[in-house]
Swiss-Prot record:
Protein's GO biological process: lens development in camera-type eye; visual perception
Annotated keywords: Eye lens protein, Repeat
Segments forming domain Beta/gamma crystallin 'Greek key': 2-40, 41-83, 89-129, 130-172
Record remark: domains: Has a two-domain beta-structure, folded into four very similar Greek key motifs.
One GO molecular-function entry: structural constituent of eye lens
Listed Pfam families: Crystall
Family according to the record: Belongs to the beta/gamma-crystallin family.
Listed name of the protein: Gamma-crystallin S-2
PANTHER family: BETA/GAMMA CRYSTALLIN, CRYGMX PROTEIN
Length: 173
């Protein structure tokens, strides 16, 4: 079972809250989050309640201030600890919504979507195994989107504000 500790102040100071499962609304437990300890597993943090807004993936370790996890501010309002999966890594991406247009299937990382797909936009995706992360820019940079197994008919289904994806990779457990 995963465990994460949220602290209101930097360097693990101030009020704290320990969490060991998914939580759709963290606001009753703390008003701001400036440092985090991930004691086991890996976690997905969300800027807004109900797993919405900016996303951050944290692995086991210490994060003494929000800039260490590439946070834009001290706002963490929901979190998930993904369950372990033995599925193979496989994902299809499409150039149009509702699985339309050109399709490519991937089983490995992609540092540049444009170099492999010849498009910068991914409008829909079908994740058939394990977990993946989409990045806004090439070489795993920029805003990220956590992709669980399932069908994503539009980029808004994975929390995107735009269809532009520059790179993606698998999450190794």
């Amino acid at each position: 079972m995963g465990k994460i500790i949220f602290y209101e102040d930097r360097n693990f100071q101030g009020r704290n809250y320990e969490c060991s499962s998914d939580c759709a609304d963290l606001s009753p437990y703390f008003s701001r989050c400036n440092s985090i300890r991930v004691e086991s597993d890996w976690w997905v943090l969300y800027e807004k309640p109900n797993y919405m807004g900016y996303q951050h993936v944290l692995t086991r370790g210490e994060y003494p201030d929000y800039q260490r996890w590439m946070g834009f501010n001290d706002c963490v309002r929901s979190c998930r600890v993904p369950t372990h999966t033995q599925r193979p890594y496989r994902m299809r991406i499409y150039e149009r919504p509702d699985f339309g247009g050109q399709m490519m299937e991937f089983m490995d990382v992609c540092p540049s979507v444009y170099d492999r797909f010849r498009y910068r936009d991914i409008h829909s995706s079908h994740v058939m195994g394990a977990y993946w992360i989409f990045y806004e820019h090439p070489n795993y940079r920029g805003r990220l989107y956590f992709m669980r197994p399932g069908e994503y008919r539009r980029y808004s289904d994975w929390g995107g504000y735009s269809s532009t994806i520059g790179s993606f990779r698998r999450i190794m457990e």
